[in-house]
């Protein structure tokens, strides 16, 4: 619904166990039935146990980016940690850029795309948002709607298993449609390395960093 409501003009497809028409979109029962070369990215909302095979099916159809919203990974104990490592290894093997898992989605106003499972579509602007907390992204997008202060991109990094907040901020630093980066971080594994990377980012664009508990 959010993708359609934002006015995204690219090809949109979906899977559904019954193969029904959903919101006017024809669906297929399996990713293996997706027409080859039709899509660039898959938004994964299926159980963690099915996602390895799903990535393989998508890769076979030419999809090279995946945003995994599914929970049940590194935040879910030892078994989840193992599942997350397998997910990352599979994505790398297949040449798929992996965002998430356990994130809420991604927004790009220049592309009129709101692939976000919770938040509203914000007005266009020049702020790039990257957050470890999906709720922070949702709150900021609601604030953006309320104030009219627009954004360029927003991404909920989730567990950041393969791509983290610093990676998104480095992209914002080179993005001609973003003037300032806003980041929210909770857990930091290697603080010195993170600060070194953010220091380089701040040489190109202003950066606001919020550290949560």
Regions found by a protein language model. Give the residues of each.
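Catalytic-core regions of core metabolic enzymes
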Residues: 1-213
């Amino acid at each position: 619904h959010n993708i359609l409501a934002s006015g995204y003009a690219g090809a949109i497809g979906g899977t559904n166990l019954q193969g029904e028409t959903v919101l006017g979109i024809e669906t297929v029962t399996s990713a293996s039935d997706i027409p080859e070369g039709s899509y660039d990215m898959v938004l994964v909302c299926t159980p963690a146990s099915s996602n390895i095979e799903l990535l393989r099916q998508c890769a076979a159809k030419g999809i090279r980016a995946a945003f995994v919203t599914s929970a049940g990974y590194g935040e879910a104990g030892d078994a989840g940690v193992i599942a997350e490592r397998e997910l990352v290894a599979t994505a790398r093997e297949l040449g798929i850029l992996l965002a998430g898992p356990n994130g809420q989605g991604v927004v790009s106003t220049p592309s009129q795309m709101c692939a976000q499972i919770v938040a509203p579509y914000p007005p266009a602007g020049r702020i790039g948002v990257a957050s470890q907390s999906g709720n922070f992204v949702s709150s900021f997008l609601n604030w953006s709607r309320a104030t009219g202060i627009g954004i360029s991109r927003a991404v909920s990094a989730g567990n950041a298993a393969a791509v983290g907040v610093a990676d998104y901020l480095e992209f914002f630093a080179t993005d001609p449609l973003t003037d300032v980066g806003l980041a929210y971080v909770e857990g930091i594994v290697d603080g010195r390395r993170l600060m070194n990377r953010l220091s380089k980012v701040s040489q190109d664009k202003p950066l606001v960093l919020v550290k949560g508990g």
